[in-house]
UniProtKB/Swiss-Prot annotation:
Tissue: Heart, liver and brain.
Modified residues (N-acetylalanine): A2
The protein's name: Mitochondrial 2-oxoglutarate/malate carrier protein
Protein origin, superkingdom: Eukaryota
Keywords for the protein's UniProt record, in alphabetical order: Acetylation, Antiport, Lipid transport, Membrane, Mitochondrion, Mitochondrion inner membrane, Phosphoprotein, Repeat, Transmembrane, Transmembrane helix, Transport
Organism field: Bos taurus (Bovine)
UniProt modified residues of type Phosphotyrosine: Y102
Length: 314
């Protein structure tokens, strides 16, 4: 029996009423911000791990758990939420822009008969949207890296930003507007790598699990494929991520930057800290990836349901 739409759920032309694009973009940003509240401590630990032992073989933190305990002891419970305002602004700018660009490009490239873009085209759309969102979100990213790194420094060396807006204002005032986009190339590169790795590894992992004969196309299969995809994505994107973190946190020494460019970061990390130091902070990065994605979609679904109930029904 065919389902019938409720009287208030359709417009004058008989088509189902849907949320305006602006509302979809707003909800996308808010969903990302909601998820960030829960995973911010993991972001902070990841950033501290990536800066640990910079330029030396000796590390400040032995493991991610050691880093978390050390931060709690030295800075208290509030310390693990340092930089939350910057994390929220990053989601507000990055997620909203990425979702907006993706939606617009997806609709433009959908056929007149409603045929959606193919896999390869969707991958290109995703990478383009991710890179654009990363560019827009770079100022908040710079503030986030600096704010989360501050607690590891001696008091006289700390930047002491009060919140993300204070950080952005002082960066412009003390270092100039271009500094807000310091590290934008590796930030955009990371977004491209993450989108490409997630798309490719998820579909391949899902197919591998189905072909094994132990899984059927259900939520367990999707969960396991997501976990494998997250592992691959983390491994692929972490070297780019540590480049981004180091560049955005660097200071000027005798009028010269600590690193010339991204390649210089990679060379120095491998030379002075060891090859596997490119994956510092792997555990919190991987642990953050899954929950943040899941929570984002949960919040997004709940906001969409509430909007439909309040404004599109009855």
């Amino acid at each position: 029996m065919a389902a019938t739409a409720s009287p208030g759920a359709s417009g004058m032309d008989g088509k189902p009423r849907t949320s305006p694009k602006s509302v979809k973009f707003l909800f996308g940003g808010l969903a990302g911000m909601g998820a960030t509240v829960f995973v911010q401590p993991l972001d902070l630990v990841k950033n501290r791990m990536q800066l640990s032992g910079e330029g030396a073989k000796t590390r400040e933190y032995k493991t991610s758990f050691h880093a978390l305990i050390s931060i709690l002891r030295a800075e208290g419970l509030r310390g693990i939420y340092t930089g939350l305002s910057a994390g929220l602004l990053r989601q507000a700018t990055y997620t909203t822009t990425r979702l907006g660009i993706y939606t617009v490009l997806f609709e433009r490239l959908t056929g007149a008969d409603g045929t959606p873009p193919g896999f390869l085209l969707k991958a290109v759309i995703g990478m383009t949207a991710g890179a654009t969102g990363a560019f827009v979100g770079t100022p908040a990213e710079v503030a986030l890296i600096r704010m989360t790194a501050d607690g590891r420094l001696p008091v006289d060396q700390r930047r002491g930003y009060k919140n993300v807006f204070n950080a952005l204002f002082r960066i412009v005032q003390e270092e100039g507007v271009p500094t807000l986009w310091r590290g934008c190339i590796p930030t955009m590169a990371r977004a491209v790598v993450v989108n490409a790795a997630q798309l490719a590894s998820y579909s391949q992992s899902k197919q591998f699990l189905l072909d094994s004969g132990y899984f059927s196309d259900n939520i367990l299969c999707h969960f396991c494929a997501s976990m494998i995809s997250g592992l691959v994505t983390t491994a692929a994107s972490m070297p780019v991520d540590i480049v981004k973190t180091r560049i955005q946190n660097m200071r000027m020494i005798d009028g010269k930057p600590e690193y010339k460019n991204g390649l210089d970061v990679l060379v120095k990390v491998v030379r002075y800290e060891g090859f596997f130091s490119l994956w510092k902070g792997f555990t919190p990065y991987y642990a953050r990836l899954g929950p943040h994605t899941v929570l984002t979609f949960i919040f997004l679904e709940q906001m969409n349901k509430a909007y439909k109930r309040l404004f599109l029904s009855g």
